Amino acid sequence: MPSIGLLSLGCPKNLVDSEVMLGLLRENNFTITNNEANADALIVNTCGFIESAKEESIRHIFELAQYKERGKCKALIVTGCLAQRYSKELLEEIPEIDVILGPGHVSNIVEVVNHALEGKDRHTRVEDLLYIYDEHSPRLLSTPSYTAYVKIAEGCDNRCAYCAIPDIRGKFRSRPIESIEAEVKDLVEKGVREIILIAQDTTRYGLDLYGEYRLDQLLERLGPIQGLQWIRLLYCYPNRFTDQLIKAMAENPNICKYIDLPMQHAANDILRAMKRPVTKQQARILIQKLRTEIPGIVIRTSFIVGFPGETEEHFKELLDFMEEVKFDRAGVFTYSQEEGTPAAEMPNQIHGRIKQERYHRAMKLQREISLSQNQKRIGQEIEVVVEEVTDQSKGVYTGRSSYDAPEIDGTVEFTSSRPLRIGDFVKVKINRALEYDLMGELAQ
């Protein structure tokens, strides 16, 4: 059977699509390969969220296109967000591409690959934006065996002024609770111990299906599943974080005391311009409530600097808020002017040099805050999953704590007098803190 190589770019939501496509291809007897030079067909699942992601996607498309000349590749398929957003331009400007497939057509990947391998006409499929996978969709996990992402909804109904995702991914649509529960049980039976729940807006979960937010009820269904060690939430909107959700997180011991709560800014003028439906005071109250009701919770956020109209006073207000709230984790991004979004047409666009200068100032402050927050862990025992044997002879391991999401947060390096396996969950006593990472020893 033909062999397939797939390169997945961008966020975990895109990764789930890639895993479903690989699962469908494997189920239909395609051979999956990591060697692009030996692949009969190559798939690039692209990101198109901001300018740097678009540039990275295009660079990889050109790199893989070369295998049509110097490898055995007969078909190049481009999928994902960039494919949806710029389908016509990509097909016109990169002749090596055979098919453009939008995220609404993930389930058609087998048909599309066969079509391309048979040398049929080049074409695009980007019309439908209704698809969402379910518990019956095969998946070939690309994450470590003990962790998996589960997409609980697709699309987005938020119309933030800077973002094109609603046009790329379609309207928000939730999966039924029963579907998610069945998938999680199946993953746990296969050895997964950490489930990371994702969507464009996880806190909106259920509104379209049930007429009310039901993330709390979903967590209550998943919490008792035997063998499930950690449940983690990413991409939560501050204005939809209900008291019931806080209660569910506080009462279920295997829900990580960790929340990803993108704020994007703190100045109310900028939040309004961004069309973010939250004020600084509302965010402050929520964060205080989270820290009171869930003692020890770690809060991650993200901020955009250099949004159109952001003055030095607005930026200082953001820095003051960061200093006041002391987020445990924060990512800072410079505003990207995305065509087709309201923000792209706004006056008072900020010069790139000023954006970079504000980015570095915000990150400098956050590094100081992160170090201070991490130093509070010294002397504590925290739960860690072993991810790497760093030095077998010296008993040195690298892991990730329940307070850290994969890829985006820090690590824990520690020593152990007994051998450990990758995927083991252990208690580590922290004895040293860095800006993002912790160090310690296996707790006795």
UniProtKB/Swiss-Prot annotation:
Catalytic reactions on record: L-aspartate(89)-[ribosomal protein uS12]-hydrogen + (sulfur carrier)-SH + AH2 + 2 S-adenosyl-L-methionine = 3-methylsulfanyl-L-aspartate(89)-[ribosomal protein uS12]-hydrogen + (sulfur carrier)-H + 5'-deoxyadenosine + L-methionine + A + S-adenosyl-L-homocysteine + 2 H(+)
Domain MTTase N-terminal: 2-118
Statement: the UniProt record of this protein carries the keyword Iron-sulfur: yes
Domain called Radical SAM core: residue spans: 142-372
Gene Ontology cellular-component terms listed: cytosol
Binding, [4Fe-4S] cluster 1: C11, C47, C81
Enzyme class: transferase
GO biological process, one term: tRNA modification
Principal localisation: cytoplasm
Location in the cell: Cytoplasm
Keywords for this protein: 4Fe-4S, Cytoplasm, Iron, Iron-sulfur, Metal-binding, S-adenosyl-L-methionine, Transferase
Function statement: Catalyzes the methylthiolation of an aspartic acid residue of ribosomal protein uS12.
Similarity comment text for this entry: Belongs to the methylthiotransferase family. RimO subfamily.
Protein name: Ribosomal protein uS12 methylthiotransferase RimO
